[in-house]
Amino acid sequence: MLNSSKSILIHAQNKNGTHEEEQYLFAVNNTKAEYPRDKTIHQLFEEQVSKRPNNVAIVCENEQLTYHELNVKANQLARIFIEKGIGKDTLVGIMMEKSIDLFIGILAVLKAGGAYVPIDIEYPKERIQYILDDSQARMLLTQKHLVHLIHNIQFNGQVEIFEEDTIKIREGTNLHVPSKSTDLAYVIYTSGTTGNPKGTMLEHKGISNLKVFFENSLNVTEKDRIGQFASISFDASVWEMFMALLTGASLYIILKDTINDFVKFEQYINQKEITVITLPPTYVVHLDPERILSIQTLITAGSATSPSLVNKWKEKVTYINAYGPTETTICATTWVATKETTGHSVPIGAPIQNTQIYIVDENLQLKSVGEAGELCIGGEGLARGYWKRPELTSQKFVDNPFVPGEKLYKTGDQARWLPDGNIEYLGRIDNQVKIRGHRVELEEVESILLKHMYISETAVSVHKDHQEQPYLCAIFVSEKHIPLEQLRQFSSEELPTYMIPSYFIQLDKMPLTSNGKIDRKQLPEPDLTFGMRVDYEAPRNEIEETLVTIWQDVLGIEKIGIKDNFYALGGDSIKAIQVAARLHSYQLKLETKDLLKYPTIDQLVHYIKDSKRRSEQGIVEGEIGLTPIQHWFFEQQFTNMHHWNQSYMLYRPNGFDKEILLRVFNKIVEHHDALRMIYKHHNGKIVQINRGLEGTLFDFYTFDLTANDNEQQVICEESARLQNSINLEVGPLVKIALFHTQNGDHLFMAIHHLVVDGISWRILFEDLATAYEQAMHQQTIALPEKTDSFKDWSIELEKYANSELFLEEAEYWHHLNYYTDNVQIKKDYVTMNNKQKNIRYVGMELTIEETEKLLKNVNKAYRTEINDILLTALGFALKEWADIDKIVINLEGHGREEILEQMNIARTVGWFTSQYPVVLDMQKSDDLSYQIKLMKENLRRIPNKGIGYEIFKYLTTEYLRPVLPFTLKPEINFNYLGQFDTDVKTELFTRSPYSMGNSLGPDGKNNLSPEGESYFVLNINGFIEEGKLHITFSYNEQQYKEDTIQQLSRSYKQHLLAIIEHCVQKEDTELTPSDFSFKELELEEMDDIFDLLADSLT
């Protein structure tokens, strides 16, 4: 806590403040906390090594090191440094690619007693030369493949190449080099006003203080995974590194290729289960919180964030807005989003531990709450000063008038205290700006431009584009015309890419004030079309048209031609990433580095690659939101929900090899992630969890029945036992049994319906045949590439459920619910007992010839689909059987509709089924032709084949959900499953004729747990087997006599055959409104139009 003398000093300096304000300022700066002030960074790291040596410390791509391994390698390299003269406060330049080796190097420098100077490998040669010269680094640590970057650099120190073979022969124990927390740890160069960057000297104690902040305020633990995003030259990289390595967490290095692709970045975060990440707001704005599942804490820093960005993320993560200049060890204040953020800005928060904030006037007098002033910082994190810049150090690091004997850093930032103890950032007092999170002194950019032989005057200003992102504009005077490309090239030789102006404007002379200085207020605004000095050339092909469309959108400029320069029009690296991201939606791929090399469309087009989006091939793990059909399942609260399976039995006369089967199913369950689901109860909800590859992935049993004369009964009983053994909470949900018999082997597979459906079985049969064949021939099992995961489908479906496009469907379902009555069908008996054990079956089938007509000849008459015909027949049958003109049934669909752009689930295993109410309107049953067309049109009017009905019910956010009563309660369920036997018959196996116990098999026989409930009064399932259409009617024997259902079955067959015959006999194709995309047009109106056309032609 601040002591009383400090409080008195605050009172003395705040001459105009009230007593309440003095107390307020005292309270907000009361941040004193204990921290390991006498320990260095590497000592704190070594403490973590001793506590958790085998924990993963650092990960990069497929390489990782434990804390022990990282410590050993750093010790080995540190010994080399010591041998070569590195010691206390000596500087070592580090110019390495992002890699584990880079962080070994940093730790090694600290352990040797030195301080490191990070140098970005993408810096221009002149900037690298200046940093090495200015810092007088004794050594430069680099990598062999980067040596070419320093070929033309004059460096008097030692160049050390990081080589594993040289390092590993050294001793790996801790060194115990004498060191103090006030020793220099690193020097970071930032933009300077003199035309050259300046080095800021940071000591160990600032990071030692942050260690406790990470643990106590950010709640970072050894279980966290920290994303390493920032460039080594940016002090956020120090923050990320030691947030992990001083707390026992794991550091995950994210490479540039991933960062440059927003989609790839989101996938990486989810795959690696990153929990804490620090990002510039300019990057976060392009990410989607619905697609990033693992992040628990999101920290934005480097530039101002916006209320809309905070509100977008705050419900999904702990959102922290952090502020802090490099001169105060990275972070000085933080603000945590706890409620809806309104207004025009987001606070930068309150001081972190052992940090004091003072907002003062030019005389260092404290400003009152609400008054703007310069933000000054004191405390443990203050830098030692600027390297070899004593005058600048004394200007910026002044004696602290509030705490004798300490220093105060004058940030040059303008801010004010808010009544709630937070600080509002108001901008800069001087000409310093932030571009994409990097500090930029406008004077440095100006001084570089003035080096150009033809530029006599220049003024650089900052502006905001149509996306509210800052950019630089350089206005210059020159007697000669200077091409824009030449200016960009000249700038890039000395300035990092973020400091290169997006626009250049040439003037004959500068506007001046009465004092003869440049009048910045009179400088022209950049014209967003300025720079298009070439004649307009239109795009010549589809790809060029696509690029023009994207550039115009990203840059906010109209009429871009193929010769226009991306960067001359205001493009930058973030906008380049946006271009690449948007090309994804056109299935095109662009490397952002190519846009840097080829900045015009006519050049760039040759480097655009066709990229049919490749789905993520990694292992899917973690919590997954329930899909609508899964919500429906748990809502029913079936008596035994564990036993609600689908199963299949295969037969192979020559027998199966057990060892091959084990390899095959291991691969299948690894490949098809949904098969590893389990379901837990948590806080009154069901949570769906995709397990990884640990534990038992499936249960496999072998039965030798070769000497058993009663094999069929044993197979049925054992299958039934396995069916009943599935447990949703513990898994696995896949049960396999191999039955050896005298006449071959029977392979039984039971999978809980929550993770499999009819299409899934087709995929599994195909993969089983492929993998078994490969394994039999001693080949590596290689299944077709994964399509998008069930997890991704769930995420995207929830987003779609709340999209404007989807909400337009509400009108259809609203009308259906309000203008349709629930009609109950007749029953022979009244009962409340709807148990599965009372379910019985009646079936009908068509001949092979009749089925062939249905599949191949019928649809031509009215351009129908098979469901149009099957449901028309059902409508006629129900009218005849129950004397009902109009009834609502429940229709099941496969649910894999193409509603999500770029989502490919063609080979994804899971339960995707959709179900929705459909009206069978038979009021004109005397006109067969009309009824077929009416059924077709009614089905075509259903948006996206009905998938939206239960999306509205279960996924749409309550406040967006339309007022739908969901009161329709169909008693009849209809599901056409398609053709199954062709998917099972292969050269390896066929379908077994034996019973599988109680299951919901793909053939539609609905024998689940005997004590489970049957949801519908009648379940009607259609499927094709051995060339014949089969229709089964399942019913409760305590509600119906068998003869009653037989009547319905006979009526259905009779009407179906009549429809088949009618359509086959019809010579001409009769079109309906939906064939012309006129779904709202009634059939009668369509007939009137055709009549008028006929009259006009005669």
Swiss-Prot record:
Domain Carrier: from-to ranges: 538-612
Residues making up the signal peptide according to the UniProt record: none
Modified residues (O-(pantetheine 4'-phosphoryl)serine): S573
A biological process term (GO) from this entry: antibiotic biosynthetic process
Top EC group: isomerase
Cofactor(s) this protein cannot do without: pantetheine 4'-phosphate
Positions in coiled-coil regions: none
GO molecular function, one term: ligase activity
Enzyme Commission numbers on file: 5.1.1.11
Keyword check for ATP-binding: yes
Subunit and interaction comment: Large multienzyme complex of GrsA and GrsB.
Note from the entry: The racemization reaction takes place in the thioester-bound stage of phenylalanine that is formed via the thiol group of the serine-bound phosphopantetheine.
Family the entry assigns: Belongs to the ATP-dependent AMP-binding enzyme family.
Free-text function comment from the UniProt entry: In the first step of peptide synthesis this enzyme activates phenylalanine and racemizes it to the D-isomer.
Protein name (database record): Gramicidin S synthase 1
